[in-house]
Amino acid sequence: MTIAERIVSVIPHAPVQLRLSGRQANHASSLKFFLTPGRLVACTWIPVLLCACAMTAAQSSHEWVATWQGSPTPGGTFYSPGCPSDVGLNSQTVRNVVHVSAGGDWVRVRLSNNAGLIPLAVGSASIARSSGGAATVPGTLRPLRFGGESSILIAAGGEALSDPIPMTVHALDNLDVSVYLPGSTGPSTQHYFAAQENFLAAGDQTGSGTATPFSTTISCWMFVSGVDVRADNKVRGTLIAFGDSITDGYLSTTNANRRYPDDLANALAARKGNTLSVVNAGIIGNELLTIRPQLEFGYTAPFRFGRDAVNQAGAGAVILLEGINDIGDRSAKASDLIPVYLQLILAAHEAGLKIYGATLTPFGGSNAIYGGDYGTPAGEAQRQLVNAWIRTSGAFDGVIDFDKAVRDPANPTQLLPAYVGDPLHPNDAGYQAMANAVDLDAILEAILAD
């Protein structure tokens, strides 16, 4: 297959209709997938989406589920010495360390040029189990293929899903996804805040299992946006944690996987019976209403909801925690945010997904750090109005009261002192308290009932 044959044009604003089977087909005969208007994507994206929804008879006891996600955002708008996405890479290999939630016997990887301005030439890519740092577990390194080829050109705005390969992946494994970029990429697709050290090496080091060539450490993920596994039949779908920096795990311990979705993954992996995978669709600084000038904060929640939630393999339910940045950064009112929540609820339900509304966590005392209406009386009034609506409207399939889980009973506008990372963000203990507030039994029961 030629490169030209692997590139297709997406008609602006035209949704993609996919045939469904299984749980999602009970809700609709077709599903509209939200794609970036006017973009080009590698055509491997389309058939593999179909693969994610329709299982063959030989695969009847297994289902593809998303096991890791790093929602992609543009580079080039915010210089950081820890993440060279502003200038990109040139004849370098990036080794991304990703922490999966569920295991399986086959794996596939999503590479992303979603925010690229020019086509992205990938010379080669590989996956392996990580043994720590940039080193891999001996004997586990596998090359990735795209339509049978080791290289692929991904159009600007596009993504490419690798061919599935047999590989034993265990729940809670760390995997090394290495991508070689033979030419200059320009400003690069990234996930800016990784809470994970990743690595760069000169030249093509995708086949190297040692850490030696990877002499540079970076703080972001680059060019990889997802990993799926073919899980056994006790993994009944994917739970998507969708949100901003609090979901992204800002101020959690680096390299320790202590974000609240990681804590959910730990609980789900420990279950003896039916369970779920969980992926993190949080983006630091993300908002419901506004694309911020710093594009590493991502596009608005409605803009990216299809890509980061609906289109995830095995998607069954979403936890939505968004809005605090709209209040703090934009002085948004509850009346501004509620229609957006309703839009996302409708999108989830049309796709056959459950969606759970999470109350906004306390931010008292954060104004000195973040300015705006973060922690002001006006901002607090809007937070309370939003939370009252989430709790009482009945619009969501359920409510997760993160506010109650982490607030200080003696001063409920602020985080409990033991949970403070800063006045806006929880620490590891606070993220664990958030995870403890999620009724996983109820979510799993709701998914299985469909």
What role is predicted for each listed range?
Residues 256-259, 263-268, 272-280:
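Phosphate-binding active sites in nucleotide-utilizing proteins
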Residues 238-242, 247, 277-282, 316-321, ...:
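Structural recognition of the beta-strand scaffold that forms the well-ordered cores
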Residues 1-37:
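N-terminal secretory signal peptides that target proteins for export/translocation
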Residues 287, 294, 298, 328, ...:
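Catalytic His-Asp segment of secreted/periplasmic serine-dependent ester chemistry enzymes
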